Amino acid sequence: MDVKIAPDWKELLAPEFEKPYFADLTQFVRQEYATRRIYPRGSNIFRAFDKCPFDKLKVVIIGQDPYHGPGQANGLCFSVGDGVPFPPSLQNIFKEVADDTGTPPPATGNLDRWAEQRVLLLNAVLTVRAHEAASHAGRGWETFTDAVVRAISERKQGVVYMLWGSYAQKKGAIADPQRNFILKSVHPSPLSVYRGFFGCRHFSRANEYLRSIGKEPIVW
């Protein structure tokens, strides 16, 4: 199957694209885009991979599914397009970045700048119906993104995994803590942020680790 995804990821994930579940997933997603309003737009489904080459990967942040409001989802977990108001979880992420590193909140919630520094902003589910959270869950995306995490774990070491909330922690459990740096906290959602996300210092701790293995830190 010819999947429109960055060449290095395409080579890495080629076996997945030939499996029956992926054919079923593709058929479902195409039908959904043809008959409903789906986010993100089709060209952005694999944008997290297009923005972050596999060979230079430094950090993995795992989300659940795309934002389902108009103009929000842009293919990177937690990220929104330029000019779009910050969703609450993203506001809380920026507050922790500011408190942790001294970097003031940015003018835009577009996290392209993180992805371009080799942060993979990976949702577990890559598409969603407008105004219907988790509407594409259980259709095969989770199997695909599990394969992504597994491929990273098997082929790379020295990667920082930021696992926020039980869902991300379960998905990231395959990553070997002896070969990587695993950071866990509650989700930055307003429902849980005061139970350990604020004050987790994941951003400075990630940079300390990257420096310790000779890699450039991330400008958060």
Describe the role of every protein-language-model region.
Residues 197:
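C-terminal substrate-binding/active-site "lid" region of AdoMet-derived donor-dependent transferases
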Residues 3-6, 15-163, 167-170, 175, ...:
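A polyanion-binding, active-site-adjacent surface
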